[in-house]
Structures are given as structure tokens and as C-alpha cells.
Amino acid sequence: MRACLFISLFLFAFSFPSLAWQHQRATVDTIPGKNDLVPFTIRLPKYPLPGRDSAKNAAPRKNLLAFPFAVRSLETNWGLGGIAARFFKPGKQDSTIRTSDVNVLGLYTLRNQLILVLSSTIYFPKEDHILRFQASYSYYPDDFWGLGDHTEFTQKTGFSQKQYFINPQFLKRVHHNMYIGLTYEYQHTGPVTYPADGVFDKEDITGRHGGNTSGIGPILSWDTRNNAYSPDHGGFAEIQYEYFRSFTGSDFKFTLLSIDLRKFFYLSPKSVFAIQGLGGLTFGNTPFRKLEELGGTDMMRGYYGGRYTDKCLMAYQAEYRRFLFWRIGIVAFAATGEVASSPGRFELDGFHYTGGGGLRFALSKEEKLNLRVDYGVARHSNAFTVQLREAF
């Protein structure tokens, strides 16, 4: 285990000179989730949010970045991959806007999972408009426990499925740090390969035979964080609503509503307290790949991504972050959450709990870009993960 961790640290450290100028690529809080792309394996190169950036006015020292990386999670075991990114500014150079980018990423894991991703963010003059784009292909052996908040561990069923995904988004500034926008999402999934007479057939799971989901909807985003990667004060709030119908090209008729709220409290020059709340609702004939899921490397660390799955979700987490010395820091975190078949079916005794701690290694002290090593503990489960960027 120590040898594997050393390899991961080495790969990230090797790319440090290039990573130091990646400030224009903020974390993506609105990119496709587990069911769209890759079940909570890595923090992909993400769409910069329309908030403030700690080094917004600085021009990159280079316009091309390429480096290898290693990741680990319950869902993937260890994975190796590489990323290449091109940075540019459309038209005339403008130091008042962030740099646009195009990223290509590939990942292969010890569970024979393959993920290929193309993503891009383009900033228009004065950042009054932002265009985001993401496309991906994935072949993903995974696990499923059925629907509900009280599924037994023994219900676990292995399956595999191919997915194609595309998601353009367009945002327009309406007031200071407030943006409104439009998102379109298309996903094609092949038939699920799974054991006969398993949970997929017993529960008549929607989407197990594959199909197309195609939907459109609005985005409302507000961001006052002072740093894209690891803020020490400010807040973030985003609401997305997506409408899937036959006239949009979807084989399934359903709607999605998601809410993401975050707040960061400055305690001292070396410590920060952060909290997050997530909410999700789906209505209609929702395929299982678009349902709400509990677990993963970001929320409810310690549980497998999708350990509990249903139409509605609420989850909360808190994290204390402390810088120690040089590039080293520590964190302690706790989370709780549950899923339900409808908003009225949430129960006080239905919450699941996780907790844990981790180490941080600053790849870029200026931009607060960290390598994250976490160990989460949950009921009948625990997880050791190595990721790039904070959980939130």
C-alpha cells in the first residue's frame, strides 16, 4: 500500500511545475455526475465556476499541459491515466478574463474500467458569457444493491455497461457573481450485463436494457468563494433543473432537480471549517443511471458510490482543514445522508453516517491545489482514496 501511495505522489509531484499555473481551471461543481460519466472515481478536469478566481488576472506561463496520474477509490481500485490540456484566450489577449481550455483525459483501472473524456470551457469578453462542453465514453464494471435506503449488503450485484455522454452549457452573467444559463444533456447507455434473476430483474429496474436520455433545463449559479480549489471563505449555491421528454429525444420521461449549497468559514491563517448540503429529486420514469445516489469519494466518504440509490436524496457534510507545515495539511470530516422514493418518505432514523480523516499535499501552494488522501469509515464499509482537489 505504501508503495502504491508513493507512486501516486510521484506522478503528481512530477507534474507540479505545470500544475502550478492551472488556476484558470476551477473545480467543476456542475459537471455530469456518477451516472453520466464515471462513478465517483476521480475529480476530472472541471468546468470553472462563474465565481471569483484567486489568480484570475494572471496569464499562464505555458499553453500546453500533459502529465500522468494515479487514483484510487472503492469503485475503481487503482487506476492509471493521463491528461493533456490546451490553454488559450479567444481573439485578443484580455488580462481581465480567465483563460479558456480544452482537456483530453484517459483512465484505465485494475477493474478493467475505461474512461475517455473531452471537456472545454470558453470565456467570452468580460466573462459576461461562458460556454462549457463535456463529452465522454466509458465502459464501467460496477456494483448495484437495488433501490431504497435499507438495502442489504448481500444484495450486491455486479454489472457492466457502456455509456456515451455529451453536455453543453451556456451561462450569462446577470448580476456580479450571479449567472443564469441553459444546459442540454444527452446520454446513450448500452444494455446492462448482469447475472440472471438478480436484483435488476427482481426489482424491474428502469434503464437496465439501455436507451437514450436527452434533456434540457435552466441553471442558476452564485459563487463568492475566494479560491477555486480550496477556499477559506465565501459561499457557493447552484440549482439545476432538467426536463427529459420524447420531444427532446429521450426514451424516458422524467425530470431532475438538484441543489448544491456550500459555506466556508475562515478560522485562522492555517485553519478553515467548511460545510455542504446536497439535495436531489427525480420525478417520472427515471432510469437507474439518473437516480440519486449516496456514497463516493466526495460525499459520504466511506461508502461505495451508489451504495444507496433512489429518487430523492439529502446529504450534509462538514470538514475541518488544518495546514501543518511545508506543503502538508490534515483534515477531519463527518457526513450524514439518506435516500427515499419520494420527499415525504424521508425518515429521521433513515440517515446513514460516515466520518474520517486525511492528509493533504499542496501541489501548488499559491493556488491551493491539493493532492487528497482520505480514509472514510461507514457502517460495514470503509474506503481509502487518493484524489486531486478537495471533496468540495
Give short role names for the model-derived ranges.
Residues 1-30:
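Bacterial Sec-dependent N-terminal signal peptides
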Residues 23-53, 62-65, 130, 134-267, ...:
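Transmembrane beta-strand segments of outer-membrane beta-barrel domains in Gram-negative
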Residues 56-66, 70-212, 307-309, 369-370, ...:
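Gram-negative/organellar outer-membrane beta-barrel architecture
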Residues 200-204, 289-300, 338, 345-357:
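Solvent-exposed, glycine/polar-rich loop segments of beta-barrel outer-membrane systems
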Residues 217-218, 356-366, 381-392:
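Outer-membrane beta-barrel "beta-signal"
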